[in-house]
């Protein structure tokens, strides 16, 4: 066990000290192991705390070892008092006198209020290793030097858990986490033994091991970081026996600040209050049977996490988003694509269109669509059935002829594809025929919510309810990919845009129009005018200089 000197009153310059090894430790005002700066009655070296040896404490004995092997020796002028109670002097030690101290005794240095209490801090180590394994002799010697007691039996009196690196997670380790006992490596005890005396217990952050669970490596953190690491989350659980370490699961969730509900309770609440819309409601799925709750429709909107990943999140102190499986949204099975809106546009006259208008009623017909592996019955109206026959007629005009009246085609009917169109595929006499039926403009907005099939084919039949278009067969030739090109469209990088100053960009020469001859004549005239101006300017300079010189000479000589 480790000894601690704790100030009874909060006085200036007094701190708690931990003694980790046997030895002699000085108490005084300056340059001492225990510094006390309360009043002038404290000597420079006032007393000494002598620890003859460190004694281990066996929790089964119920009391610390006796004797404690801790003595106090007075080295001061004003004396040292032990077990001094308020209102009494206690036992005073004169210079060079000593006294044996026990757990809970108080020591007062000087005549002031510098009172410290001696108490033992037990270190009971639960050794979690292989059943046949033992603590190494070197580590055992270190633990003995600091008074640590090692045991292989877990109990609530254990203060620390000693494990090897990459040790497997067991129920005993989970019990230690629930009891807020730190899991450490053997190097932590070596660091403690090297300090001898210190104002705080050494940190175990760098000496926390990694555990393994079903092949997953878990980096354990300090116990204080595990607390409330899952606060705000609600886990939906099944029966405890379905999960790994199921008997520890509820207690672990409570210790981390999380809530939990049973599957039946959650389903009952979801029907009444619409539960399950919260992102922090997570379904806990057993790793050994991931499809355990796949048949319960009320759990479909929930995110999922396996019990193994949940234990890893608890021991690591945080729940990563990658460990959570997002909910599986149900998408209705349909053979239709998204709604397609085709804006009115100009189409070239050579676009292959055909339309034959016939009378139709609203009675329903059924046409079988036989695929390679299944048969699908599609219900269509008689109008669609007539459109189907007309589509077949437009593809093979020589094979099938309609007896109904054929309206004279018009070129404006090429623009028959407007706001919304519906494509249906049918199989008639062994040949697939796509039919596109135009929806009138005055259709209600609800029709836009319906799904549509828009499939391109060179034999596409475009039907207009109001007008019909001229039909041209293209079966003899290949696919005309320019059929949808706008007439008169000009590229953005045209010659006209790049060279805007050219009158006729495709004319190689302008000699025929006389523009070059006129330009040369004007240029020659301009140069002649510049030469004349230059001569006049140069001839005017000497005259000005001569006139200026004669006038100065006249002024100097006084002649006129």
Curated annotation (Swiss-Prot):
One of its GO terms (biological process) is mitotic G2 DNA damage checkpoint signaling. Residues 115-190 form the BRCT domain. It comes from the Eukaryota. SUPFAM superfamilies: BRCT domain, SMAD/FHA domain. GO terms for cellular component: chromosome; Mre11 complex. GO terms for molecular function: damaged DNA binding. It is found in: Nucleus; Chromosome. Its main location: nucleus. A motif (Nuclear localization signal) lies at residues 511-518. Belongs to the Nibrin family. Component of the MRN complex composed of two heterodimers RAD50 and MRE11 associated with a single NBS1. This is Nibrin homolog. The gene is NBS1.
